[in-house]
């Protein structure tokens, strides 16, 4: 059996070094790139899965509708007879340092709203509450933090990741 996953890695080159969008998983306290499972209808079009997960895991703050990307995939064994196929999408975004700061501020505002709803026992979007921090940082900064081993092994230590970041052979996407 195969399960399908997507990893969304927005990267911006505005500034001296590329900065990557990272989030911290609320449960495990690992810093990761946005990662999630694909719904059945998304399996044929995993970029939709990556974009949905990106929006959910950034609390609705980052919602990309069109742009450029490059991608690669890898497969890991979850258990005997179960493979996880990961589609990794590098999304090229043009966020200035000021915009990056503003997006992180909005993420934190949304987190406060969610926490207030929890206290008041009001309904809230559970899918928006998977990560407790969001950041734009260089890979050097990202590598100083507690990271999920699967991201390190299959993305950060994968030459395809660096080929995708530097590739000028980009694809375009546009969704409604």
Language-model regions: role of each:
Residues 91-97:
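Phosphate/ribose-recognition catalytic cores of enzymes acting on nucleotide-derived substrates
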Residues 4-6, 29, 34, 85, ...:
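Residues that flank catalytic or metal-binding motifs in active/ligand-binding sites
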Residues 27-31, 98-176:
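Nudix hydrolase/Nudix homology domain
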Residues 1-21, 87:
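Conserved N-terminal beta-strand and adjoining loop/helix that marks the start
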Residues 13-15, 24-28, 81-83, 95:
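Short, flexible beta-strand-to-coil junctions
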Residues 22, 88-90, 136:
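Conserved hydrophobic/aromatic beta-strand scaffold that supports enzyme active sites
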Residues 61-74, 84-86:
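A short coil-to-beta-strand element that immediately follows conserved catalytic motifs
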Residues 17-63:
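Conserved Nudix-box catalytic region and its N-terminal flanking loop in Nudix hydrolases
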